[in-house]
């Protein structure tokens, strides 16, 4: 029989060593219980230390956001249908506020409000992440807007100019071409080093597919990210989509780049937020919207900025879209967004139906940045245009009652009709600055007066082609100097004269 020699001191030292090496890891998890769930809302008991806006994880993997922190329960909105969440199920607080991955790899992709790809082209690699709700740049971080953001639409670039870092509202009834103005602006950024983000909120999947298709055909997807939450998405995701778009645009803005973001449209986001708020039993205010619906939009649109030179002079230009009912601009959401933005482009159903497209009502559209956002060449030719159109609108109303008009009035009416014709443009056909300058110069200096009104559009299209092929130096001068010099003017005058003769011969 072998005797085992037990040495207590050796065993003691082993035990002591193990005790010293033992690291006590206590994982504290904040857990609650589902009291009630339905309509995209869950009431949870027991989440004591949850933050406002914190992400919560349910047993089935659904994620929610804690919005209502009440004395006895927490109201959370779900980012999914929540059909498999059961009463009494457990909920875990993640300790995180909603954030999304960001990187250059997002360019050319279609993603949802959680920045997950929905275009079937595989995962997007990203090493960085940004909070969906980031604070807007402060006063010291900004500088005033001074560079133009060309939309390619004559009516806007000449009379309601938009600058980089501005927020310009596009407002009008449904089916007046609001999305067309926004998408044309994206198409016009080709080769301008501007990253675009198009956020579609609560739209038909077919409309979004059509927009994406246009971008792909015209090569605009290379510099564009589409964030889409369709009409059948949960209200929570429709509410988050614009903030996700803003976070993606901010990533590029803080990297010294210029960005353009379009929110299409904020009325639907406000409706989704109203639905969430009413289901959370928050008290309704005007038009049943909650009291903080102004803050919903102001904290989003204040993130658009022109950054100071210390921060690299990046910019984020926002074009929010708001839909009106029967042209009523004094409803709650339209007045809110008008008061937040730096101007608005008003699209009118009457003009649209009369065949004036883009249907921009120049009389009540404004840009509060003004000519600071125009190149000198455009200022030189466009000054007269707005005045002449305003006088024409006044005269036209007056001329309906008067039967015998003097010669000067008739001439002014004829000029006005031709100028209105000059502002018409086909969809997805944005014009470069030099083409716009040539077009406006032709109109305000009376070179169109000898043509019939129905010939004007055709004449201008062909004149622009003639300039490109026969007088390329005109475009070069405008592009390089950004000034409508005397040389440019004389080249343009000769070109107009030569082409008018050709055109009139063809017409005969």
Curated annotation (Swiss-Prot):
Instruction: Please name the CDD domains in this protein's record.
Output: ATP-synt_F1_alpha_C (cd18113), ATP-synt_F1_alpha_N (cd18116), F1-ATPase_alpha_CD (cd01132)
Q: Does the keyword Nucleotide-binding apply?
A: yes
Pfam families (alphabetical): ATP-synt_ab, ATP-synt_ab_C, ATP-synt_ab_N
Instruction: Please indicate which superkingdom the organism of origin belongs to.
Output: Eukaryota
Q: Which UniProt keywords apply?
A: ATP synthesis, ATP-binding, CF(1), Chloroplast, Hydrogen ion transport, Ion transport, Membrane, Nucleotide-binding, Plastid, Thylakoid, Translocase, Transport
Q: Name one GO molecular function term.
A: ATP binding
This enzyme catalyses: ATP + H2O + 4 H(+)(in) = ADP + phosphate + 5 H(+)(out)
Q: Where is this site: Required for activity?
A: 365
Q: How does it assemble?
A: F-type ATPases have 2 components, CF(1) - the catalytic core - and CF(0) - the membrane proton channel. CF(1) has five subunits: alpha(3), beta(3), gamma(1), delta(1), epsilon(1). CF(0) has four main subunits: a, b, b' and c.
The record's comment on protein family reads: Belongs to the ATPase alpha/beta chains family.
Q: Which PANTHER family match?
A: ATP SYNTHASE SUBUNIT ALPHA, MITOCHONDRIAL (PTHR48082:SF2)
Q: What is this protein called?
A: ATP synthase subunit alpha, chloroplastic
């Amino acid at each position: 029989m072998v005797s085992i020699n037990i040495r207590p001191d050796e065993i003691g030292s082993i035990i002591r060593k193990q005790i010293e090496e033992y690291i006590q890891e206590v994982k504290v998890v904040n857990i609650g219980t589902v009291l009630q769930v339905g309509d995209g809302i869950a009431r949870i008991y027991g989440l004591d230390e949850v933050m406002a806006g914190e992400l919560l994880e349910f047993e089935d993997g659904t994620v929610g956001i804690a919005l209502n922190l009440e004395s006895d329960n927490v109201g959370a909105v779900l980012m999914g249908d929540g059909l498999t969440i059961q009463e009494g199920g457990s909920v875990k607080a993640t300790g995180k506020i909603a954030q999304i991955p960001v990187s250059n790899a997002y360019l050319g992709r279609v993603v949802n409000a959680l920045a997950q790809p929905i275009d079937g082209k595989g995962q997007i690699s990203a090493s960085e992440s940004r909070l969906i709700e980031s604070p807007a740049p402060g006063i010291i971080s900004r500088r005033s807007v001074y560079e133009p953001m060309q939309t390619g639409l004559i009516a806007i670039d000449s009379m309601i100019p938009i600058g980089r870092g501005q927020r310009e509202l596009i407002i009008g009834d449904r089916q007046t071409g609001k999305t067309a103005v926004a998408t044309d602006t994206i198409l016009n950024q080709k080769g301008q080093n501007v990253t675009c983000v198009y956020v579609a909120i609560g739209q038909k999947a077919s409309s979004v597919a059509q927009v994406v298709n246009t971008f792909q055909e015209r090569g605009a997807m290379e510099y564009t990210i589409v964030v889409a939450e369709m009409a059948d998405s949960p209200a929570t995701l429709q509410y988050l989509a614009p903030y996700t778009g803003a976070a993606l645009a901010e990533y590029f803005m803080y990297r010294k780049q210029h960005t353009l973001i379009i929110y299409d449209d904020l009325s639907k986001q406000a409706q989704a937020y109203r639905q969430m708020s009413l289901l959370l039993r928050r008290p309704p205010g005007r038009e049943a919207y909650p009291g903080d619906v102004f803050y919903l939009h102001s904290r989003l649109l204040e993130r658009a900025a022109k950054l100071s030179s210390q921060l690299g002079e990046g910019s984020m230009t926002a074009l929010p879209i708001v839909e009106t009912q029967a042209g009523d601009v004094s409803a709650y959401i339209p007045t809110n967004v008008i008061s937040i933005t730096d101007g608005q482009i008003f699209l009118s159903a009457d003009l649209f139906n009369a065949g004036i497209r883009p249907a921009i009502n120049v009389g009540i559209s404004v840009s509060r940045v003004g000519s600071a956002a125009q190149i000198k060449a455009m200022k030189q030719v466009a000054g007269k245009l707005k005045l002449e159109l305003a006088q024409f609108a006044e005269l036209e109303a007056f001329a309906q009652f008067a039967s015998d008009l003097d010669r000067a009035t008739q001439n002014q009416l004829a000029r006005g009709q031709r100028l209105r014709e000059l502002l018409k443009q086909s969809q997805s056909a944005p014009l470069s600055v030099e083409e716009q300058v040539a077009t406006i110069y032709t109109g305000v200096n009376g070179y169109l007066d000898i043509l019939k009104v129905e010939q004007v559009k055709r004449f201008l299209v062909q004149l622009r082609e003639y300039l490109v092929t026969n007088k390329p130096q005109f475009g070069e001068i405008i592009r390089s100097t950004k000034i409508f010099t005397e040389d440019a003017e004389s080249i343009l005058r000769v070109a107009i004269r030569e082409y008018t003769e050709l055109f009139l011969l063809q017409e005969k």
